[in-house]
Amino acid sequence: MDKAALRKAVTEKLKRLTEDEKHEIEKKMTDVLVRSEVWKEAKMIGITLANGFEWDTQAIIETGWRQGKSICVPKCDPKMMRLNFYRFTDYDQLEVVYYNLREPKPQASERVEIGQMDLLIVPGIVFDREGFRIGFGGGYYDRFLEGQTIQTVSLAHSMQIVDKVPTEPFDVPVDRLVSEKGMVVCKKG
């Protein structure tokens, strides 16, 4: 299957989960993540605010705050097709923008560079065990991560993990997958 077909097939599976099923999976993935060494060692974490059928990241964000971690969320720049991350400490620092996305208000948040973050939780829809992913099709994270060494993880239910994701030269794999069954260290190449 090509990327578009895989994205569509897995999105449909995710949308069929009941709220209770989804919540139970999110609790398990959050537990796996926050017990991991990569989480424990991180002081500043980049994470996406969930929208629609995506895995809800609120429990992860709030766990980070309780543990004294700095939490950063992205703001998309659609003209430049890039991401800028901002540290936020309260949901009042967010605004609703296009596609009903919640993003930081730049005037109410501190912008951070990728090198300041210790861990980035990268969103996606389909993944393989080498860490390659199919996101939402904009390439924002691949551009953001190009040439960077930041630790990366993605939240991925086992139904989202396939044998092989079709790749292109600009695709940047993640280091680890966090599923409801545990942490998968990706084998790149």
Identify the role of each PLM range.
Residues K79-G189:
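Conserved phosphate- and dinucleotide-binding cores of soluble alpha/beta proteins
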Residues M1-G115:
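N-terminal active-site beta-alpha-beta segment that forms phosphate/nucleotide-binding
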